[in-house]
Design a protein with these regions (language model features):
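Non-catalytic accessory regions flanking glycosidase/transglycosidase catalytic cores in CAZymes
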Residues: 1-200
Length: 200
């Protein structure tokens, strides 16, 4: 329960409110709840996939999951629309956002802490096909994929790069100078047909 008591007549705007626990699994800053992470640990998973599902694509590419927005101080991470915010017209959630409170740095730490191989999932230049079907305007043309390819390369460097590299240094500055030993990378989520295949 969060309780904020204010006195006076001026208005107050709260920019960032977090109810993340302080007492986290392995005492990680901005880490997972102890009970949830312990349950994951007790299952001995071989692989931990993140992020899951259609959130990778977003309902449009503007709202796709972008890993670079999920690192750095939590209070500086931007909000993003959630893929499920307006998918079903009978079930609108206009205030349902992603906070990126759990980002890729915390994800890599969690995988390490529970002994699982991380399997990050990155966008392949396609918005959610279920929502956009085969509308080519909802997807990046194949000859314009370079920024998406670079995001994949940068994530690999963030996870495994030496501390003298741009993204390896960022990882070290966040408190983890040793590489995370990333071995796997998924590109795209639940896509199909030639729109997807031509991007591989």
């Amino acid at each position: 329960c969060l309780r904020v008591l204010l006195s006076g007549t001026r208005s107050v705007a709260l920019e960032h409110v977090s109810l993340f626990p302080v007492n986290t699994f392995k005492n990680r800053e901005n880490g997972m709840r102890r009970d949830l992470a312990q349950a994951l640990y007790d299952m001995h998973p071989g692989v931990l996939r993140f992020p899951g599902g259609c959130i990778v694509e977003g309902e449009s590419l503007k709202h796709r999951y972008q890993w670079k927005n999920t690192i750095g101080p939590v209070e500086n991470r931007p909000l993003n629309n959630n893929r499920w915010q307006s998918t079903f017209h009978y079930r609108l959630f206009p205030d349902y956002y992603q906070s990126y409170g759990l980002g890729f740095f915390e994800y890599f730490q969690l995988a390490e802490d529970i002994g699982a191989e991380p399997l990050p999932v990155l966008n392949v230049g396609m918005a959610c096909q279920f929502q956009n079907w085969d509308n080519p305007k909802a997807h990046v043309p194949v000859d314009s994929l370079q920024p998406y390819i670079q995001d994949c390369l940068d994530l690999i460097e963030f996870a495994n790069g030496d501390t003298c590299t741009t993204w390896g240094r960022k990882r070290a500055e966040m408190g983890h100078p040793a590489p995370f030993n990333l071995k796997y990378l998924a590109v795209g989520n639940e896509q199909w047909n030639t729109l997807y295949y031509e991007r591989l």
